[in-house]
C-alpha cells in the first residue's frame, strides 16, 4: 500500500505510513465490504484517492474520501487521519 501511495501522491513518509496503517485497519474492519459490497483493495483505494482535488496531500486525500464515506454510510470517522508525525516529504 505504502509503495502505491508514494508512486501516485505527494506527502511525507509519515503520511504514507499513517494512511497505509489506516487503510489496513479499515480493511480489517471489513466496513467497506459490508457497506459497498466490494472488497477493499489497493486499486480501489488509489482510484478513490485520485478523485480528490490535486492540491491535497495523501493524508488529505484519504480524509476527503473517508469524509464522503462517512456522509454516505456513517462509521468512517474513526479511520480518518487526525495527526501525522513530522517527516520528510515527497512531491
Give the label of every model feature segment.
Residues 1-91:
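Acidic, polar-rich N-terminal leader regions of halophilic archaeal proteins
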Amino acid at each position: 500500500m505504502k509503495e502505491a501511495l508514494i508512486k501516485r501522491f505527494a506527502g511525507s513518509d509519515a503520511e504514507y505510513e499513517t494512511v497505509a496503517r489506516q487503510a489496513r485497519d479499515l480493511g480489517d474492519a471489513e466496513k467497506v465490504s459490508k457497506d459497498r459490497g466490494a472488497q477493499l483493495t489497493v486499486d480501489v483505494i488509489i482510484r478513490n484517492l485520485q478523485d480528490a482535488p490535486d492540491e491535497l496531500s495523501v493524508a488529505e486525500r484519504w480524509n476527503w474520501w473517508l469524509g464522503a464515506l462517512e456522509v454516505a454510510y456513517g462509521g468512517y470517522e474513526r479511520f480518518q487521519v487526525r495527526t501525522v508525525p513530522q517527516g520528510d516529504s515527497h512531491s
